[in-house]
Amino acid sequence: MNTASSQYTWRLAGPAVAVLLLLTFSVYHETLLYLTGLWNQLDIGEYAHGYLVLAISVYLVLRQRRVLAALRPCPNAWALPAVLAASLLWMLAALVDVQVLQTIGLLLLVLAIVWTVLGNRVTRALLFPILFIGFAIPVWFPLSPLLQDLTADAV
């Protein structure tokens, strides 16, 4: 593959993804505030590892710089339904006020945007680092008291 053409497409695709993600984060800022609020509750400690998970995800992306540089971003219009589905998931979760589903919808929206702009091959390389952020999402948060009781009874 021609590295000059790959660098040129990255010069277009990189800023495009960055702008789209910044717009997404500004539109869905309430979900981000909810997440960071949970991550900042150090006294509870259930999701205080969120910043660490985010840092590890960034590290995993940076570790793959050479692999990503060799790949050529190729937009994929077939991923647009995934953007729509993730947006609908977030919207439905917002309508019924289920913040956990909103955070999952936002994570899936980030993945769908990356897939749409960068294409299949680049998304395949970034799939694990993006989905790793899911460990910082409070999926088990509503079940924490029940799980704690079960653990206490077992011990």
Predicted regions and their residues:
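Hydrophobic N-terminal alpha-helices or hydrophobic patches in metabolic proteins across all domains
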Residues: 1-155
